[in-house]
């Protein structure tokens, strides 16, 4: 049975548990605990991680209320285990399963699954790939909280492929989430080194314990990330409880992270509400994405490289935003911007980009002035499909960008303007600064170059650079007057409310419909003849 089949079967079981009040998110957390026990059993590593008496067979051998109570005790015991890594995985973990028969069903089901391929037991990476599949499923189903910003796997894979992490390089993700970037970086290094077998023992140990480090603010998400890393044989620094530390990047925890050769990250979107920015940055701001940008510049080794997913506002925000972009282009070689299509994150409408840069320059890693000369921009947003479940975003959509980016991880491969994938040549050209004195055919290309001087003089250091006209864009001059638009919107709302009222009464919820109507009357004032 392949991993996709295992994921499908395990997820199908979740539907049964949901009848008992177990949410998708809780189910994934529950599976994290059980998968850890099962992984240790299947890979022969129980003695390395688990105390005697608290292992898979000890759980499996019990049924009913006895099993339920043992499972609760097991979670408490492992949460206070002397091994810091095990303690971190099970810290403050409790089960959300309330019915003993559901736990018995889940344990029995997991135990009966075909965990083997032929005569060879599954490796930790096999478990890891399956677990990642479950995390992806959870993101697809919840579409809220962290799930709405779940970084698409094709994008992670492309970013890591272009950054090309090497053995003995430290890869950092200061907004780790479920550790997707770190897992992919590990996978890339293993693919280049015969699963680390080509490396000497000391370098192998470095890759397992020191090469990958993340920081995550949310305890529950950090636990999922730790589990993900462990299942992919990334143990991290055992003294710090694994590869993923718990803490705030925008506070002292971020300052204490070791310097990195590579940063690949997708910082959380939105305002700074709920985020305690206690760290002193060169350019103080309440915009947490801009604070993350400053952290990344600071945390990179000279000559280090980064790829950062940022929302559009990072490219054009004034004031401190302008100062931070100038700082970025001064201290780093910002060589590439990828404008991402909308709809690839589960929070619909979020417009994002990837910034690729090197700290200093390749010829002088310690250079901290005038490091940026030309910035190349690939527009994968304008006139692209509306991505979602019916039109998934795949590696094929990123392949043209990978081709023009080139093999050099610092963006120094020979490049030429001009790339017309996805019917770009049919696009209209926007009347903008970007297209002044530009050949008409070249202006329809998705791949353009803009000098640092042009960005300074024509854009006032804004990096919101676009030149293709979206075929679905609306000309503001042709819009009706605001009062007409408002009246149309109000009319549609009234019609929708009427249909909802009728539906509620059809469903036997007339009293609730009356209550809601009363609230509307109080809110707007009852209209009298």
From Swiss-Prot:
Chain residue ranges for the region called Disordered: 405-444
Residues binding S-adenosyl-L-methionine: 148-153, 178-180, 216
Disulfide bonds listed in the record: none
Biased composition (Basic and acidic residues): 407-418
Enzyme Commission code: 2.1.1.72
Molecular functions per Gene Ontology: DNA binding; N-methyltransferase activity; site-specific DNA-methyltransferase (adenine-specific) activity
PROSITE patterns (UniProt xref): N6_MTASE
Function according to Swiss-Prot or TrEMBL: The subtype gamma methyltransferase (M) subunit of a type I restriction enzyme. The M and S subunits together form a methyltransferase (MTase) that methylates two adenine residues of the sequence 5'-GAGN(6)GTRC-3'. In the presence of the R subunit the complex can also act as an endonuclease, binding to the same target sequence but cutting the DNA some distance from this site. Whether the DNA is cut or modified depends on the methylation state of the target sequence. When the target site is unmodified, the DNA is cut.
Note: Type I restriction and modification enzymes are complex, multifunctional systems which require ATP, S-adenosyl methionine and Mg(2+) as cofactors and, in addition to their endonucleolytic and methylase activities, are potent DNA-dependent ATPases.
Protein name (Swiss-Prot/TrEMBL): Type I restriction enzyme StySJI methylase subunit
Organism of this sequence: Salmonella typhimurium (strain LT2 / SGSC1412 / ATCC 700720)
Taxon lineage: Bacteria, Pseudomonadati, Pseudomonadota, Gammaproteobacteria, Enterobacterales
